[in-house]
UniProtKB/Swiss-Prot annotation:
It comes from Desulfosudis oleivorans (strain DSM 6200 / JCM 39069 / Hxd3) (Desulfococcus oleovorans). GO terms for cellular component: cytosolic large ribosomal subunit. This is Large ribosomal subunit protein uL18. GO terms for biological process: translation. It holds the Pfam family Ribosomal_L18p. One of its GO terms (molecular function) is structural constituent of ribosome. Part of the 50S ribosomal subunit; part of the 5S rRNA/L5/L18/L25 subcomplex. Contacts the 5S and 23S rRNAs. It comes from the Bacteria. The lineage of its organism: Bacteria, Pseudomonadati, Thermodesulfobacteriota, Desulfobacteria, Desulfobacterales.
Length: 124
């Protein structure tokens, strides 16, 4: 087993531990974060029905074609993604969420998304 597989295996164990404790509801959906080497993804999920309300990522055209973000680092783009998902959540009438870091350390881009979402008006 390579080091990368071991690292991912440990992250998935952390993710499972976290998911045992938290769940999204229609009133307070789960803000789930996934971080890849290049992009960051966020979605609001109702776990009772298994429905995704809102998504935002650094891989979508709204973010990729934004001239303000050209030349920015990944953490600054993550803050924008957080603000984007907060704005989309407000449009759907969602103001309070449960934060799910997805097994990732609450640092760097994961923290940047949460900071952006809080700046955008989400409560968690």
């Amino acid at each position: 087993m390579g080091a990368a597989n071991k690292k991912q295996e440990l992250r998935l164990k952390r993710k499972a531990r976290i998911r045992k404790k938290i769940a999204g509801t229609p009133e307070r959906p789960r803000l789930s974060i996934f971080r890849s080497a290049r992009h960051i993804y966020a979605q609001l999920i109702d776990d009772t029905k298994g429905v995704t309300f809102v998504t935002a990522s650094s891989n979508e055209p709204d973010v990729k074609n934004n001239t303000e973000l050209s030349g920015k680092n990944k953490s600054e783009v993550a803050v924008f993604v957080g603000k984007l998902i907060a704005g989309r959540a407000k449009d759907k009438g969602i103001s309070s969420v449960v934060f799910d870091r997805g097994g990732f350390v609450y640092h760097g881009r994961v923290k940047a998304v949460s900071d952006g979402a809080r700046e955008g008006g989400l409560n968690f």
